[in-house]
């Protein structure tokens, strides 16, 4: 009979909700509902949005270049389906409105009306109800087709994280590494904090050589970053030592200071550090400092370092950054990448086996998630 009763019924329904979701619900529905319950009922009634009689926790976030306010519903599982769609759809859409996405994915749109929702409510209540029902129906049909909530739930269980945590990459990757280590009966050390600037250079992007060229070729390396990590068996527990980059630091600093280049541009045409190049050239006229893990250091010629790594019978290898890794046992991170890579191959095979477009789309989405896991691990471990 009145708005207060309607909001009370809504709160009753939330009591047994497994997952709360909506389209742009983080930016609109949740803050609107919390504010409305506070105004119509009371602030104390907003505790029903949460568990353990707690109040919703206000939080600010940035979206579309503007700062917005929302609320975290303590103890509840809330996932904004618009953000879920943006995360697991790997091409840009011209619009992320529910109307546009509904038309693209389902061939259905929101119910059109003229004027404001307030005037629609007062002048055509039946259409107002139909408008709201269609919004919910579109969301329900989208998830029945895409199954993104099921996918996020699967990722959450596989990596033992909360369902909303799957919206990011760092926490999921970190927990996946920890879980993989525990499966091998290894204890993971606490995270270490480093003071100062710990930023790393991004990927090298070569400047194009302008003009007409003949015999153009392209090389697309399969899962480049994961493949490099696996090939070198890269991991904190597999590090033997590090060539101190004295020459390289001086060279890069000169490029930045005297030639006014950016840090990334200073590496133009360099495959690896100068120390690495000296080692691979087996130069006996270049002396290097090798810092051992966990402590100690030695002064060796580049030729001696080459022989130590590649000709001493040790199962060692050298990265272009001058880090020596051992490969007598597979590292945690390379082994995790091996697992993900194998799982993706299985999913790609299943995609070929099934016959319907819906089944193919189902497996394609899942193999794409594994691809994102593989390629995002490099960036995630920097954090």
Residue ranges and their predicted role:
Residues 15-16, 39-72, 107, 117-118, ...:
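Non-catalytic nucleic-acid-binding interfaces of large nucleic-acid enzymes and RNP effectors
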Residues 3, 26, 30, 91-95, ...:
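Active-site-proximal structural scaffolding
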Residues 118-259, 359-383:
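Common nucleic-acid-contacting/processivity interface regions adjacent to the catalytic cores
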Residues 15-29, 33, 82-170:
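Acidic, Mg2+-coordinating catalytic module of metal-dependent nucleases/exonucleases
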Residues 221-383:
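Helical catalytic core of nucleic-acid polymerases
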Residues 1-93:
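Conserved DEDDh/DEDDy metal-dependent 3′-5′ exonuclease domain
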Residues 10-16, 20-23, 32-36, 40, ...:
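Generic, well-ordered alpha-helical scaffold segments in large soluble proteins
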Residues 7-10, 78-81, 98, 174, ...:
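Short runs of predominantly hydrophobic/aromatic residues within well-ordered alpha helices
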């Amino acid at each position: 009979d009145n708005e207060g009763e309607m909001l009370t019924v809504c709160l009753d329904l939330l009591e047994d909700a497994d997952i709360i979701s909506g389209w742009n619900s983080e930016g609109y529905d949740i803050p609107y509902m919390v504010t409305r319950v506070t105004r119509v009922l009371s602030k104390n009634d907003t505790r029903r949005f949460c568990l353990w009689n707690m109040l919703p926790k206000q939080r600010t976030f940035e979206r579309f270049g503007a700062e917005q306010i929302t609320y975290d519903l303590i103890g509840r599982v809330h996932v904004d389906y618009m953000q879920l769609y943006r995360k697991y759809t790997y091409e840009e859409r011209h619009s992320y409105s529910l109307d546009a996405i509904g038309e693209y994915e389902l061939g259905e749109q929101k119910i059109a009306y003229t004027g404001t929702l307030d005037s629609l409510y007062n002048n055509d209540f039946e259409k107002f109800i139909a408008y709201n029902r269609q919004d919910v129906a579109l969301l329900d049909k989208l998830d029945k087709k895409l199954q993104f909530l099921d996918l996020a739930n699967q990722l959450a269980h596989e990596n033992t994280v909360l369902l909303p945590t799957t919206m990011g990459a760092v926490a999921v990757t970190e927990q996946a590494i920890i879980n993989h280590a525990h499966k091998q009966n290894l204890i993971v050390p606490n995270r270490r904090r480093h003071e100062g600037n710990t930023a790393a250079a991004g990927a090298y992007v070569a400047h194009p050589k302008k003009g007409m060229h003949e015999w153009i070729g392209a090389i697309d390396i399969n899962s480049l970053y994961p493949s490099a990590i696996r090939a070198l068996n890269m991991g904190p527990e597999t590090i033997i030592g590090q060539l101190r980059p004295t020459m390289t630091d001086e060279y890069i600093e000169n490029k930045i200071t005297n030639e006014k280049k950016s840090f990334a541009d200073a590496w133009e045409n360099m495959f690896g550090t100068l120390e690495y190049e000296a080692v691979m050239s087996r130069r006996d006229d270049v002396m290097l400092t090798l810092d051992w893990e966990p402590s100690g250091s030695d002064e060796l010629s580049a030729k001696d370092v080459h022989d130590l790594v590649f000709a001493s019978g040790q199962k060692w290898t050298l990265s272009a950054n001058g880090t020596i890794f051992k490969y007598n046992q597979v590292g945690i991170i390379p082994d995790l990448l091996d697992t993900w890579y194998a799982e993706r191959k299985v999913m790609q095979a299943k995609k070929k086996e099934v016959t319907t477009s819906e089944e193919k789309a189902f497996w394609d989405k899942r193999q794409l998630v594994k691809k994102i896991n593989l390629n995002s691990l490099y960036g995630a471990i920097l954090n």
